[in-house]
């Protein structure tokens, strides 16, 4: 990112502390992104509405409100419907990518996270 370019804000909705910590480390090294976090779908919805991040990374298997339902609610809300969402799943099954896209996600990636691949997806989503 060029000098003086704005830092992009990402919301990572993830209940696994290790996954959150690792992603935070990766993005800290880049210095291009500020990471907001939520531990469940309900908190993710609230933080997205209040903070208006540039992009949301949404784990699909969350407590309380899962990532599928959180995505539906975010896309149905005029205040958050335009925020790109990349779905993440550790238990990716056949058809999950298609289901995530049909739910309103802009992209899908499986865990374990391959940082370069995820970064390319983030940059592509932010460019559109």
Where are these regions (language model features)?
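Two-component/phosphorelay signaling modules centered on CheY-like receiver
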Residues: 17-36
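Conserved acidic carboxylate
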Residues: 14, 39
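Active-site residues of response regulator receiver
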Residues: 59, 89
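The feature encodes the CheY-like receiver
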Residues: 63, 81, 93, 112
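C-terminal output helix
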Residues: 112-122
